[in-house]
Amino acid sequence: MPSCIKISCALALLGAFQNSYAANNYPIVLVHGFLGFGPEQYKESGFKYWGGFDDIAGHLRSHRGRHQVLVTTVAAIGSSWDRSAELYYQIKGGCVDYGSVHSASAQHADGEHRPPGQCWAADPANNPNNYPLALYPAWDAAHPVHLVAHSQGGQTIRCLIELLENGSPHGDEGGGDLYAGGKSGWVASATTLAAPHDGTSLHDAIGNFGLVATDLASRIAAMASPGAQPTPPALAPAAGASRATGVWNTENYDSAQYEMGPDGAKQFNSWVKTSPRVYYFSIANYATEPGAPCCNNTDRLLAPFQDARFQYPRQDMAPLTKPYAGEWIIPSFGRHGMGGYTQSDPGRVVVDAGWFRNDGVVNTLSMRAPAGQPVRDYDGTPLRGSWNFLGTYAGLDHFDILGWPRKGKLAYPIYDRIAAILYRL
């Protein structure tokens, strides 16, 4: 066979292979969670939010064809509103606008809804200030994206869709383009992994959320840069990292710490709804087991005496969160952990035994879909305007599903499955 024919055949086969997903090849946009970070944070060590020392984004870009996969960076400890604003302008281009009414009501520390210098250039040929380039300036209804998010990123992308389509619930936000609404069709799908749609009981169980979050950020930094002393992501002077006054103040409703609690999530869900024009998908996971007298896969050194009514962390759960996942917080003076925490105070979200199973950070019950919003088990036929639940991954903790620290290749099949579904929509 002549070489030109061989090449033509090879190209034809490659084209068929690339199009094996069928319907679309829209960009996938990855959105990190609470205490998350972008690709530049640990560039020296090579540690990535998506994949640890492996690379989920890089894998997706070349798996079964060529695809555009965009990795975003938003505030590590910001509210979903603020993170949505950063996400919008980072993708589309322009300077971040948090909204005038929102900024005033949230008492943003700098008093500005358009902080200087927090910009992305949509046109590389017209960039006199040398701003970083926007990720996808063509973004609109004719050029939609697939949003894929982990943990608090799930709340962030839901907020973004709400603002895109319906605008700000406050009305005019000082002219910010994001808050005008009317952008239906810009998002083809939204997929969440281990997202606290109804909050996480970890927020209430640990008491001092700020102290624990700061400690967790330091542990993440140590894991990401072995032998070094890097600045933890939540403490780095990143854009939007501390938009509101008193970020750990329990009365600060414009903060991640509030929205991630069950009560804050309920308030968030009261205005952020499921769009009838978007495909929603969710994945749950857990890394705890019911207590037993002996012989289960839990960490018996951490919890030698167990009660079958409660959940305990598996031996292989990440050390980062294992002390908070079981019946008791270790160490503590009789404070229940996620595997044993309940509360039934009047006027608050009831947290009962159904919340005990968890992945070390988020309760499995909370990962399926926001309470009261449409949800169904995915049966191979996706439905718009409803959460299509893709199932629960047993034995995976909050960081396993990201491939941390060196489990990226074990996590790849999860993302391959998601991509296969999205590209067929």
Predicted regions located by residue number:
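N-terminal non-catalytic accessory region
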Residues: 21-148, 152-211, 382-425
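N-terminal signal peptide c-region/cleavage motif recognized by signal peptidases
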Residues: 17-19
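Bacterial N-terminal signal peptides that target proteins for export
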Residues: 1-7
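Helical cap/lid subdomain of alpha/beta-hydrolase-fold lipid enzymes
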Residues: 162-425
